[in-house]
């Protein structure tokens, strides 16, 4: 994988992969026009709306594995935002398992 240094570019890449992954999984996707706020996109499937924040997973310096270790903000928790985690090495996505 080509290394991407620009953090904004990393986020853009993750979001583009997220959109196509969501399409492949039967969702309609509506993206945020700005780069700030508690959500990146809204995905609709079977009449249900899912508020999504896409996060690029990072490697721990002590481990070769990627992980998503970012917590939702209070606003995201109140809105019911779900994290969709992007692995930049494999280009795969998965839903985060959120606690309460």
Show the residue positions of the predicted features:
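Domain-level recognition of nuclease-like catalytic cores that cleave nucleotide substrates
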Residues: 69-70, 75-100
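Acidic-basic catalytic patches of nuclease active cores, encompassing PD-(D/E)XK
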Residues: 1-32
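Structural signal for conserved beta-strand scaffold positions within catalytic alpha/beta enzyme cores
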Residues: 31, 53, 85-87
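Active-site metal-binding core of divalent-cation-utilizing nuclease and nuclease-like domains
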Residues: 24, 28-38, 42-46
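Conserved catalytic cores of phosphodiester-cleaving nucleases, focusing on short active-site segments
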Residues: 18, 22, 41-43, 47-58
């Amino acid at each position: 994988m080509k290394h991407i240094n620009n953090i904004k570019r990393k986020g853009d890449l993750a979001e583009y992969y997220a959109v196509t992954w969501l399409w492949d999984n039967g969702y309609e996707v509506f993206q945020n026009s700005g780069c700030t706020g508690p959500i990146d996109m809204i995905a609709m499937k079977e009449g249900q709306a899912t508020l999504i924040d896409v996060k690029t997973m990072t490697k721990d310096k002590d481990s070769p594995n990627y992980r998503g270790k970012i917590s939702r903000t209070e606003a995201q928790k109140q809105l019911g935002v779900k994290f969709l985690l992007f692995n930049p090495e494999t280009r795969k996505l998965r839903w985060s398992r959120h606690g309460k």
